[in-house]
C-alpha cells in the first residue's frame, strides 16, 4: 500500500471515529446533584481557552488556524473550549456600534461553532469583556457618552440602564441562526454554556453587592428568558467579597468588587468559575509559595461550591508564562491538574479546567507568554493530554459506581 493511500485511509478512519464519538456525545450538557452530566452520565473534562477564534475566523483565508487548533485539541482529548462571542469596536469588530453588527465577523463565529461541532469540542461563549481588549465595558461607556448620555465612570456599566440595555441587545445573539449549520445558537448543543462577562470587576464597590444585585441577577434572568437550554455562568475569577468576611483572607491580598459566594448563589447561574494567575497575582513569591497558594485557592472554592453553592466548579482560566521557563510551567501545570483530578475524584463539584491558552502555528503576534502550540511544546502537550484522558476515564468510572 502506498504512503499516500495509507495516509488517506488513516485520515478517513480518524474522521469516522470522530463522527461516531461526536454522535455518542451529542446532547446538551446539564447539571444534576452539583455535577455536570451528559446524556444522564457524569461529564468531566480538560479543556482550553482560545479567545481569538472568532477574530481570526472573520477572515476566511485564516480559518485553517481555527481548524488546526480544534482538530489538535480533539486529538489530544480536550473537549471544552472557552472563547469570545464579542468584539466591540476596533479591528474586525463584531458589534460596530450598539446593535450594529458586521455579518462577516458573525460568519466567523458561525464557522467556529460549526468546526467545534465537527471535532467534538464544546464551547463556552462569553458576551463581553471587563478589559479594554476587543472593546469591553469601556467601549459600551464610550458609545453611551457619544450618544450624549452622562456617564461618570466605566463601572456604571453595571448600573446604568442605557448600558444594561446595550448589553441585553448583544445577548440576543443567542437567537442567531448559524449560516453554516442552519441551527440557532440557542438550539445548538455544541455550546456548553454562555458566560455573562470575562472577569467582571467593580472598583466602585469592593463589597461585590453592586455586581450581584444590580447586574448578575438581571442579566442572568434575561439570558434564561431567551435560552433555557444552555448552562450559564458569570465569568468570575473567584475573589471573595463581604458575604463571608473570613474567606477574604484567601484572596491574593486584595478585592476586585465581586463576591464569589453571593454572585454564584443566584438561581439562574448554573455553575461557578475561578481563574488563577499566580505569577501575576503573587509576583515576587517563590514557585513553591505560588503552588501552595494555588492549592489553597482551588480547594477553598471547591469546598464552597460543594457545601454552600451546591453547584459544579470549573477552573476556567489558569496558566504560567513560558518566559519563566518551560520546565517551570510544566511543574506548575502538573500540580494544578493533580489538584483538579483529586478533587473531582473525591466527589461532587469539580468539573474540569481550562488552560490559558492554545494557539495555532504562525500566531506569534498573539503570544502573551502563556501561549501553547500543541506539538511544538511536546512535554506540555503530553501533560495536557494525560489530564484529558484521566478526567474522561474518571467520568466513566463514576458512571459505573
Curated annotation (Swiss-Prot):
It is an enzyme of class 3 (hydrolase). Keywords: Glycosidase, Hydrolase, Secreted, Signal. It catalyses: Random hydrolysis of (1->4)-beta-D-mannosidic linkages in mannans, galactomannans and glucomannans. Pfam families: Cellulase (PF00150). Residues 1-24 form the signal peptide. It is found in: Secreted. The active site is at residues 199, 317. One of its GO terms (molecular function) is mannan endo-1,4-beta-mannosidase activity. Its main location: secreted. GO terms for biological process: polysaccharide catabolic process. Disulfide bonds: none annotated. InterPro entries: Glyco_hydro_5, Glycoside_hydrolase_SF, MAN-like. GO terms for cellular component: extracellular region. Substrate binds at residues 84, 198, 277, 356. Its EC number is 3.2.1.78. It comes from the Eukaryota. Belongs to the glycosyl hydrolase 5 (cellulase A) family. This is Mannan endo-1,4-beta-mannosidase 3.
